[in-house]
Amino acid sequence: MQGLYIKSYGCQMNVYDSLIMENIIKPLGFTVVNEPSEANIVILNTCHIREKASEKLYSELGKMRKIQETKDLTIVVAGCVAQAEGEQIFARAPFVDIVVGPQSIHTLPELIIKARRMKKQVINIDFPIISKFDAIPVEEYTKNQEVSAFISVQEGCNKFCTFCVVPYTRGEEYSRTVEAIFNEALVLSDSGVKEITLIGQNVNAYHGTYKGCEWDLGKLIQYLAKIPNIERIRYTTSHPRDMHQSLYEAHRSETKLMPFVHLPIQSGSDRILKKMNRKHTAEEYIDIINNLRKQRPDIAFSSDFIVGFPGETEEDFEHTMKLVQEVNFSQAYSFKYSPRPGTPSAEYPNQIPEEIKSQRIFRLQELLREQQLAFNRNMIGQTCSVLFNNKKGKFDNQIIGKTEYMQSCYINTDNTNQFYNSILPIKIIDAYQNSVTGIVVN
């Protein structure tokens, strides 16, 4: 058997795609290895959202080249950088053998055979008529899942935010059929999966037709909740413009749907939101938050923020800080704006100096850290439902799980196998910045 090494960058969709690539390549005679030095094929599944992610690729490729100089190694660049840069990757890193876009990964076995037999570079960054989901049997992307699993229900984006490359790298919005999603969930359930996370670039833009009716994400969630062994359902990443009434209703009535929503806003300034082409206001975002809290009072929120968008004034930034204070997030992700080639905002005037970006991101992250720590500390003394999905904690006698609110929860135990793949009531006894600790409630 030859070795296969896959490294994923970025979003959950890339993790999902990496699993697909692993399962369709292994029948060619490969086994997964933990180190690139042990591999005969290395796949770097890339992200293109931020400038540093692209540069990380070329840094990693330099390491792969050194390995390639000592052995027969096929180097594959997959994912969104592959889609965006295409042939430019060969020009910048001529030792790369294969470039494949995220919508063409189902052709990877063919590309590998072609590249290795013909000793030539090959590329496929097409947006094929037949989607990768139609080309790959469901069994190939449900293998090797454990306690929690992703299910891709939607890909692509039609929103065209001015800072974002996703519409150009993932293509237009595409929703899988209800039957395909349900069948995948059934296979996962039969294999022991207890928690599914429905993923998509704009997951709540999901739409389909089934049994003569129109379906959206809320209706899909309530249908999947009927699968007996699936005990938890999550979804990510959502967009404020696609919050439909059925999704509110699902949060109110479906106990399997976890009380946690990742809902990016990017900025609290209406002026900046307009320049970003988000097509919603800060007030509309707050209304969504309040409506979700009305349906599920214990719900927690995370979000994404971009600091230093072109033309952002101090007043604009203060609007963001005000929104953060009003919502009170349990966790959030914040980034300094970095211009992505080919996006409208890369050409905007009034680019913000790095020094100002750094000052603002420090202030924002300080506030977000305060909120996250306060949220975690507020859990002390409460009993949470925790799914233990990781056998390895910081120490040998620990096991890690996730609360309903996506907090990492550690417990001490001499037998990690006893709790693995279990959902247990845990009394929280201590809290930290990024985690909580607890004890099992008898």
Curated annotation (Swiss-Prot):
Catalyzes the methylthiolation of N6-(dimethylallyl)adenosine (i(6)A), leading to the formation of 2-methylthio-N6-(dimethylallyl)adenosine (ms(2)i(6)A) at position 37 in tRNAs that read codons beginning with uridine. One of its GO terms (cellular component) is cytosol. The gene is miaB. [4Fe-4S] cluster 1 binds at residues 11, 47, 80. Transmembrane segments: none annotated. CDD domains: Radical_SAM. Residues 143-374 form the Radical SAM core domain. Binds 2 [4Fe-4S] clusters. One cluster is coordinated with 3 cysteines and an exchangeable S-adenosyl-L-methionine. It comes from the Bacteria. Keywords: 4Fe-4S, Cytoplasm, Iron, Iron-sulfur, Metal-binding, S-adenosyl-L-methionine, Transferase, tRNA processing. Gene3D superfamilies: Methylthiotransferase, N-terminal domain, tm_1862 like domain. This is tRNA-2-methylthio-N(6)-dimethylallyladenosine synthase. Residues 2-117 form the MTTase N-terminal domain. It is found in: Cytoplasm. Its cofactor is [4Fe-4S] cluster. Monomer. It comes from Ehrlichia chaffeensis (strain ATCC CRL-10679 / Arkansas). Belongs to the methylthiotransferase family. MiaB subfamily. Its main location: cytoplasm.
